[in-house]
């Protein structure tokens, strides 16, 4: 039986542009890190340090956790293609977002798991074994004792000017995380999956929260009425081997796609 490993964060890309997904995840063609992706990774590092301190009551301050983010930037700066932001810009933006996350988003949640270590999950669909992997950011618990997942998302368009957080493109990833968390920790995630959005655009970053209800159900579908889930469509693409391109994708740029200059779906002849 064919087995394909799929990282949760890459799953939505398979529907957006399968050709780009194949290049990155099957052919393993790497790309330089962008300044804005470095911001996102650094924010994750600093936020994780702060939230882990909250969970374990070790007393790390927001500013002390910011040091973790800055150290990460210094460590990874040599991997970045500095095209639109300088290292100074990246550090300043990272600290802005870090401060707002720790002061305005984190206190809204009672986290019980930070940077969850989960084993892979194998799901067989239509003769294809899909091995799901990933590291869920958070599990929170509400006042009634119910659990939910949360993921941090940064990016130029992560939050609109009116504070709306884009959630649609994160449904597949959220569904994978719910499956992995429930299997790893033997819990049921009844609450909506939360996207903590933080924009890297503008002088003052926008932040907000978006909710994804029933993410796992949207991923797996409903066998009782033969409703297909997103994972069934992903399996069909894998089974067919038809990794077609999408030249109208928002990520059809040199910055995001490793085959941009040779993609036949853009009229390039290899």
Kindly give the residue locations of the regions a language model identified:
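RecB-family 4Fe-4S metal-dependent nuclease core
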Residues: 1-270
